[in-house]
């Protein structure tokens, strides 16, 4: 299979979306050997409004012309997603695009993450009513899939997502398949701990294999790990067909309905297992008819997910450092998947702030990065001695107040940002940030007020057009000489806040947005101090009149490899 046939294979499956859809990469939400999933926001106001101001998810997958099996699995995944767009219990498909050898699969973004995220990253232990609601959503999704003769073949907590309203949705159809009526499948595929015994034995199987995986998933959610998790995957596939089916470890901790549900799903004989349609009337599934309890769970989990994902990346980095320093033999227990995932995350991190242009007419994608990105802030202490300075505009619902030296080139009430050195030609543009109430700025203002009380400045006899007002936003001044910059914005001081009006020449920089301590889509502007990147991050809803515009001249197309 050559590259042209690969291109034709995916292009024929492109969805008929808007001729040109533009969104911006906001956050890395998942990564593995398959590639990386990023959360993205629409840049155009009309697109944001038509999509309910919701983020979307973009899955980046590297395609290789020689890897025929992987390409065919991707094709099946796209076909199944396209055919399932009218089922609310399956993640919604938005489109598929090609960028060189990079395949972009665009789907709805489930803000609550996966069940695995919730029980593993957030440390949540679900109560029985929550487990019943999750299983009810999975069963309804399976009813739809099985009616289309589709077998998922990889049901597990990591592939069950929750949207913002707490609705469970099936995802990751990479190993799913569509069979002819009455046809048995023979391919041994899936995740070992969740695989049905008939799959392992090679006896031929049908959609009842998903019912077994559902029973294992129910135990996984209840007990945080699947049965036999202490057995290596290479050995567990030999024990599953030859041992009695698993059950809940402490049956008395759960209702008779839950115990019976697990027992029926985990019948060794697939003919004795109920179908997904039959499970809809099971008392345990009927107990999970309300999704409100899951919405409460999602609301509690969302603030923790960003922090825990960043922590997981740090752990991968530590494992990689340990591998490099100790040698491969000393740390052979570190899986190679972790190394690949870390590489994927690093590559995806570099795409934050980049703009993705999806064109359904040409059936291609373009990934654009700013031609003149701003340099990272200079290294400062995280104490109060750091200097605050110019604010720069970043695409996305964020404004970042970087700790650059304070602005000191002022004329006619205008602040001109100071460069880091005389050779710096970056366009440090300012923007409107509204009322600033961060403890960081308040501390600086209080310290400045104390200094003024001790040493009151002399009252000027005549107004000077070059009067320095940089001390209004910083307690220190730069020691290096600066070059006078042209006026770029108009600033007025209102109480303890700065109202900086944006200019037309906006520098859309690609920067690291750091670790955000609260949800991205907040109803109010909030501030959080990130000691690692030494910056104050503001995020929240943009003003009604604030409309993102994309200027192609400010960007250049890049190749990506995630």
UniProtKB/Swiss-Prot annotation:
For bias type Acidic residues, the affected ranges are 542-562
- PANTHER family associated with the record: STERILE20-LIKE KINASE, ISOFORM B, STERILE20-LIKE KINASE, ISOFORM B-RELATED
User: Where is the sequence biased in composition, kind Low complexity?
Assistant: 421-431, 442-454, 476-494
Q: Name one GO biological process term.
A: positive regulation of apoptotic process
Name it: Serine/threonine-protein kinase dst3
Give the EC class as a word: transferase
SMART domains linked to this entry: S_TKc
Alphabetized SUPFAM superfamilies for the sequence: Protein kinase-like (PK-like) (SSF56112)
Gene name in the database record: dst3
Reactions catalysed according to its record: L-seryl-[protein] + ATP = O-phospho-L-seryl-[protein] + ADP + H(+); L-threonyl-[protein] + ATP = O-phospho-L-threonyl-[protein] + ADP + H(+)
Q: What is the lineage of its organism?
A: Eukaryota, Amoebozoa, Evosea, Eumycetozoa, Dictyostelia
Sorted keywords for this record are: ATP-binding, Kinase, Magnesium, Metal-binding, Nucleotide-binding, Serine/threonine-protein kinase, Transferase
């Amino acid at each position: 299979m050559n590259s042209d046939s690969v291109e034709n294979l995916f292009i024929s499956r492109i969805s008929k979306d808007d001729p040109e859809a533009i969104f911006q990469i906001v956050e890395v939400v998942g990564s593995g050997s398959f590639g990386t999933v990023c959360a993205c926001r629409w840049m155009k106001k009309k697109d944001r409004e038509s999509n309910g101001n919701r983020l979307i998810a973009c899955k980046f997958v590297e395609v290789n012309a020689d890897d025929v099996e992987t390409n065919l699995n991707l094709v099946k995944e796209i076909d199944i997603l396209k055919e399932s767009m009218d089922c609310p219990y399956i993640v919604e498909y938005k489109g598929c695009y090609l960028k060189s050898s990079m395949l972009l699969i665009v789907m709805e973004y489930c803000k609550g993450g996966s069940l695995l995220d919730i029980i593993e990253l957030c440390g949540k232990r679900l109560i029985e009513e929550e487990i019943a609601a999750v299983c009810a959503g999975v069963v309804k999704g399976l009813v739809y899939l099985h009616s289309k003769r589709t077998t998922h073949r990889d049901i597990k907590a990591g592939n069950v997502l929750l949207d913002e309203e707490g609705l469970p949705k099936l995802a990751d159809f990479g190993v799913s398949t569509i069979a002819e009526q009455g046809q048995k499948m023979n391919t041994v595929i899936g995740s070992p701990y969740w695989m049905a015994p008939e799959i392992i034995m090679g006896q031929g199987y049908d959609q009842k294999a998903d019912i077994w995986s559902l029973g294992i998933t129910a135990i996984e959610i209840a007990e945080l790990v699947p049965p036999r998790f202490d057995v290596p995957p290479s050995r567990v596939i030999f024990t599953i067909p030859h041992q009695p089916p698993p059950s809940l470890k402490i049956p008395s901790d759960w209702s008779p309905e839950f115990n019976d549900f697990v027992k029926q799903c985990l019948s060794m004989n697939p003919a004795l297992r109920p179908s997904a349609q039959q499970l809809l009337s099971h008392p345990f599934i009927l107990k999970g008819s309300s999704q409100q309890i899951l919405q409460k769970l999602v609301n509690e989990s969302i603030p923790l997910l960003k922090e825990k994902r960043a922590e997981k990346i740090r752990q991968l980095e530590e494992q990689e450092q340990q591998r490099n320093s100790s040698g491969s033999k000393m740390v052979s227990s570190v899986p190679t998947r972790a190394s690949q995932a870390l590489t994927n995350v690093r590559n995806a991190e570099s795409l934050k702030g980049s703009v993705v242009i999806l064109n359904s007419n040409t059936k291609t994608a373009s990934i654009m990065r700013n031609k003149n990105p701003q340099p990272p802030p200079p290294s400062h202490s995280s104490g109060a001695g750091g200097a605050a300075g110019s604010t720069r505009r970043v695409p996305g619902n964020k404004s970042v107040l970087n700790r650059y030296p304070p602005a000191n080139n002022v004329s006619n009430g205008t602040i001109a940002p100071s460069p880091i050195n005389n050779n710096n030609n970056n366009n440090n543009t300012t923007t409107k940030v509204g009322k600033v109430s961060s403890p960081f700025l308040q501390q600086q203002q209080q310290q400045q007020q104390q200094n003024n009380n001790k040493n009151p400045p002399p009252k000027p006899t005549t107004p000077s057009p070059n009067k320095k007002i940089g001390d209004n936003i910083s307690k220190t001044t730069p020691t290096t000489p600066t070059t006078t910059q042209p006026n770029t914005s108009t600033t007025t001081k209102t109480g303890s806040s700065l109202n900086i009006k944006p200019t037309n020449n906006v520098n859309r920089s690609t920067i690291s947005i750091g670790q955000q301590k609260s949800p991205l889509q907040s109803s109010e502007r909030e501030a959080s101090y990130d000691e690692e990147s030494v910056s104050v991050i503001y995020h929240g809803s943009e003003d009604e009149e604030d409309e993102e515009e994309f200027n192609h001249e400010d960007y250049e197309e890049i190749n990506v490899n995630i």
